[in-house]
Amino acid sequence: MRGPCCWPLSLLLLFLQSWETQLQSAGPRCYNGPLDLVFMIDSSRSVRPFEFETMRQFLVGLLRSLDVGLNATRVGVIQYSSQVQSVFPLGAFSRREDMERAIRAVVPLAQGTMTGLAIQYAMNVAFSEAEGARPSEERVPRVLVIVTDGRPQDRVAEVAAQARARGIEIYAVGVQRADVGSLRTMASPPLDQHVFLVESFDLIQEFGLQFQGRLCGKDLCAELVHGCQHLCVNAPGTFYCACNSGYKLAPDNKNCLALDLCAEGTHGCEHLCVNSVDSYFCRCRAGFALQQDQRSCRAIDYCSFGNHSCQHECVSTLAGPQCRCREGHDLLPDGRSCRVRDFCNGVDHGCEFQCVSEGLSFHCLCPEGRRLQADGKSCDRCREGHVDLVLLVDGSKSVRPQNFELVKRFVNQIVDFLDVSPEGTRVGLVQFSSRVRTEFPLGRYGTAAEVKQAVLAVEYMERGTMTGLALRHMVEHSFSEAQGARPRDLNVPRVGLVFTDGRSQDDISVWAARAKEEGIVMYAVGVGKAVEEELREIASEPSELHVSYSPDFSTMTHLLENLKGSICPEEGIGAGTELRSPCECESLVEFQGRTLGALESLTQNLARLTERLEELENQLASRK
C-alpha cells in the first residue's frame, strides 16, 4: 500500500480538507486566556510544494480552533530559509479571516535552512512590543511553534537556550526528514510534550489535536512537577507560581519570600533588623550586645572580663581584647608582653655614623672632629683627601643573593663618606668567588654618584671563595697605573678593603703579606661565618683598627663608624702622631703643606732682601 507521501495531489487535498474538518469539530475554541503565538515555518528548497501546502493547511486549521483577537490570542507567522521573512506580525490582524488570507498567499523562499537565524529573529523581533507582543509584566505566555522538515545549516542550541531564558515556550515539529536531535535541542522541557515528529500525513491530524489540547485546556499544575512553593496557577499552554498572603514571589519565580517588615523602617533596631515568619527581631553587629529594650546595642567590654593577661594595657575591640604597650615599648610576638623599644635597631634611624637610644627617643653622634648638621642625622664632610681605595667583595654562593644586595648597599654607604674625584679619592671594585672579576677600576668614575650607580649594577657571581686569588689580583693589577692608580712618587695612600663571609678555599698568607709589603693598607670585614684568624692575616696592624666583624649582613651598618674613622690619608704624618679623626688627619697634612709653603716663601723673600742690602753696600762703597 502506498503511503501518504505518494498520494496524488487531488487525493492529498481531499485528505487535508477532511483533517481540517476533524480539527474544527474536535472541540470548542480556546477561551482559557490569551497567548502571543508565533509560527516559524520552514520554506527551504527541501520542502516540496505539496509538503508546504500541508503545513499551510495545518496552520489554517489550527487558527480556527483558537480564540484570536487583540485582547485574546495574537498570532504571527514568519517563514525562513537562508533568510527570514515576516508573513504578518503579532499585532497585524485581529480577525481570523485576514490571517488565513495572508497564510494562503505565502510564497516559499526555497533556499537554505538557517533555523538558528530564524529563532534569533523571533526572539528579538517577532516577540517585541513593536511587532505587537504584549509587555512582559502582563504575563501573557509567549509561544513559538517551529515547523521544519530538515537539519539546520547553522547552530541552534545557544540561541534556542537564550529564547527559552527569555520566557519563550518553544514547540518543535518535524516533518518526515527532520533531525530529531535538533528538534530536542530547540524545544522547551519537558521534551515529550514539546517535540513532535510527523512521519506521515495521517499523524498531522493527531498532532493538531494534541497541540490544540496543550494550548487550550491542559491542567499543567496537576500533570507536571511545577516546583511552586505555595500556589500553582494554570495559564493557556503554561503555568505560573503565586504566593499566599503576606508573601511575595522570589526572583526564581517559584519560591516565596515573606514580606520585608524591616524595610518599612518602623522597627527601631539600632543595628540590624531580621524578619521572622510573621514579625521581626533586632540583632547587634559583632562585638556588641543587645540591651534589655531588645532594640539598642552596646559595645562589649572584653577587657572587663579580667582574663586578657596584658602586661601594660588592654584595649577592647570588636574582635575581642587586644594588648597595647605604653609609649616607647613594642609588643612582643606573644601579643601580651612589652619590651623597651631600641630606636637604633636597624637602619631606619637615619644616623650617618652612630645612633644612641635615649629614653623614648634617640640621637645621632658624629666622630670626633666632625659636627652634626642641622638635620640632626648627617655629619659635615672632611676636606679633600687623596686615597686610592680598592674594594674586594665576596660573591661566593654562601653569601646568597639577598645578602649580596646588603653588601652593595653597605659599600655605597662608605662611598657617601668619601670625597670621590679624580684629584681626591678614587674607588675601584673587584668581586671574587671561584674566579676574580674587576667590576670597575680605580680610574673609571670621577664622582660618588657614578660609583654608587656602578655598585648597584654589579651582578652576583656565586660559586666558591678564592680569597687568595683575589688578593693576588689586587696586588698585581688593581693598584697599577693602567687601572687608574696614581704613581707611587705622589705618595697617595693605597687602601684595600676586603668583604668576606667564610673561610677561603685557597691560601691567603703569601698575597696578604705581599699586599702589605707593597704599602697597601689592608682592612678586613667579616660577616657571619668569617674566620677571625684569616681576617687578622689579611688586615694591617694593629688588627683592632683594621679588622671588623658583624654576626649577620643585616647588622653591618654598625661597622661604618670604625671604617669611616680609619680610612685616612697618611702622607706627611710622622711616627707617634695620634690620629683622633679623619678631619684631624687631613688638617695636619694641610697644615704641614701650608707651613712648608710659607717657609719657602719667607726664605725667598730673605734672599731677595739680602741681595738688595748687598747692592746698597756696594753703592755706598763706590761713592767713597
UniProtKB/Swiss-Prot annotation:
> PROSITE patterns of this UniProt entry?
ASX_HYDROXYL, EGF_2, VWFA
Q: Which residues form a coiled coil?
A: 590-623
List S-S links within the chain: C221-C232, C228-C241, C243-C256, C262-C273, C269-C282, C284-C297, C303-C314, C310-C323, C325-C338, C344-C355, C351-C364, C366-C379
Q: Where is the EGF-like domain?
A: 217-257, 258-298, 299-339, 340-380
Compartments annotated for it: namely:
Secreted
**Is Thylakoid among this UniProt entry's keywords?**
no
What Pfam families does this protein map onto? FXa_inhibition (PF14670), Matrilin_ccoil (PF10393), VWA (PF00092)
Summarize tissue expression. Answer: Lung, brain, sternum, kidney and heart.
Where is it predominantly found?
Answer: secreted
Name used for this protein in its record? Matrilin-4
* SUPFAM superfamilies noted in UniProt: Chicken cartilage matrix protein, Growth factor receptor domain, vWA-like
